[in-house]
């Protein structure tokens, strides 16, 4: 058996996640302009731009369980390579699309073959000692956050100098680099389970520690992503409503970035704290903290105040998705960890699809402040449900 240094894998996986996060954030901000450049009429630009973004998430949600099954059968490293190389084509190929239909088709395929980040997460979760899983997965999550923050700056610079299509070529090169780094440096001593000893998916969900918590954690991932994405479509408009008329996009970008930076700062610390006090305990506290911050955001009186609240919000996010991942890692047999992470990713993707639509609908009916109130209510229900589900386990550190 090959000796694996999980810390070396963590470093490479972190950089791969950084490149993937940067690639995603490089594409999304320019989608409406690119759709317009493809000849779509002004009245349909918003629809097709939204479709190009959401179709990728929907197809990813549908195919994620399939890749999870294959990862448990053949290994997580092959799935990381598969995702990196396939997305090199589907994302880099956007530079050559002649019309909107090819754009939608490639975005659909991108979702079908996506999965670098969840497979990297499953790989590290399968190798790291259980008592350090919170810290390791928290650190790993900062790679995506750092990439997401860096991407728009790089993309804006490249787009201004060379055009939007060049940005897509850059994205393709990022993803190709992530695949090459995985091939060369990620180590996995995967031992395929004999077919007669393999755990069927139905049995896997009942063989995990505390099976009744599994769906609850999936729903928590949905709520976390739903609440985060429901704010996205209205944030710039809310900032303008608070009195910001000059440099609106710049100020809105700063507010978004402030949360990302604080999240990146806190994720590793929160992961270590979760390992020390219990990830389930910290998850409930972090959700309660989120409810308070959402309520404060709803009552912000200036863009500066909103930015401060969003920065404070980011400090708690390091205990949310990384906390869920750590709990899933500790509860699940290693032979089925990729499938469990894949199903969790389905709920995460669905939250990303439903959240923006729900946020826009609430804003249209009740105003921008109402989006934060509604979001805080959703998170409060999830927090209360988790508190009830964890009630017998709050006395112990590990579950």
Curated annotation (Swiss-Prot):
Keyword presence, Acetylation: no
PROSITE patterns referenced in this protein's UniProt entry, alphabetically:
MFS
* Annotated TM spans: 12-34, 49-71, 84-106, 140-162, 167-186, 217-239, 248-270, 306-328, 340-362, 366-388
Question: Where does it primarily localize?
Answer: membrane
SUPFAM superfamilies, per the entry: MFS general substrate transporter (SSF103473)
A GO CC term?
A: plasma membrane
Highest taxon in the source lineage: Bacteria
Question: GO molecular function terms here?
Answer: transmembrane transporter activity
Q: Describe the family membership recorded for this protein in Swiss-Prot or TrEMBL.
A: Belongs to the major facilitator superfamily. TCR/Tet family.
Q: What does this protein do?
A: Efflux pump for various substrates.
Q: What is this protein called?
A: Multi-drug resistance efflux pump PmrA
The lineage is: Bacteria, Bacillati, Bacillota, Bacilli, Lactobacillales
This protein's encoding gene: pmrA
């Amino acid at each position: 058996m090959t000796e694996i240094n999980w810390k070396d894998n963590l470093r490479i996986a972190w950089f791969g996640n950084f490149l993937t996060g940067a690639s995603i954030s490089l594409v999304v901000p320019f989608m409406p302009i690119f759709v317009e450049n493809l000849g779509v009429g002004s009245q349909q630009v918003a629809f097709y731009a939204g479709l190009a973004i959401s179709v990728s998430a929907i197809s990813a949600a549908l195919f994620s369980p399939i890749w999870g099954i294959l990862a448990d059968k053949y290994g997580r490293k092959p799935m990381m390579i598969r995702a990196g190389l396939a997305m090199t084509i589907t994302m880099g190929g956007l530079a050559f699309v002649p019309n909107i239909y090819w754009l939608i088709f490639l975005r659909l395929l991108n979702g079908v073959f996506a999965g670098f980040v969840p497979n990297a997460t499953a790989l590290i979760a399968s190798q790291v000692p259980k008592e350090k899983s919170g810290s390791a997965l928290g650190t790993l999550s900062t790679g995506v956050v750092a990439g997401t923050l860096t991407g728009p700056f790089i993309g804006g610079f490249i787009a201004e100098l060379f055009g939007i299509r060049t940005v897509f070529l850059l994205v393709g090169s990022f993803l190709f680099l992530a695949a090459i780094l995985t091939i060369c440096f990620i180590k996995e001593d995967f031992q395929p389970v004999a077919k007669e000893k393999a755990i069927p998916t139905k049995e896997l969900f009942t063989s995990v520690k505390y099976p009744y918590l599994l769906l609850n954690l999936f729903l928590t991932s949905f709520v976390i992503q739903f609440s985060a994405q429901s704010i996205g479509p209205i944030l710039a408009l809310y900032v303008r409503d608070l009195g910001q008329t000059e440099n609106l996009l710049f100020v809105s970008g700063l507010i978004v970035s402030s949360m990302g930076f604080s999240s990146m700062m806190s994720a590793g610390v929160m992961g270590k704290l979760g390992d020390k006090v219990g990830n389930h305990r910290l998850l409930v506290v972090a959700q309660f903290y989120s409810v308070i911050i959402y309520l404060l955001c709803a009552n912000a009186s200036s863009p500066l105040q909103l930015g401060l609240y969003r920065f404070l919000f980011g400090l708690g996010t390091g205990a949310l998705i990384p906390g869920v991942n750590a709990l899933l890692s500790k509860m699940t047999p290693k032979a089925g960890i990729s499938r469990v992470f894949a199903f969790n990713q389905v709920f995460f993707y669905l939250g990303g699809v439903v959240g923006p639509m729900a946020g826009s609908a609430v804003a249209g009916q009740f105003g921008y402040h109402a989006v934060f109130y509604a979001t805080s209510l959703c998170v409060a229900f999830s927090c209360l449900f988790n508190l009830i589900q964890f009630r017998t386990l709050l006395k112990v550190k590990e579950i």
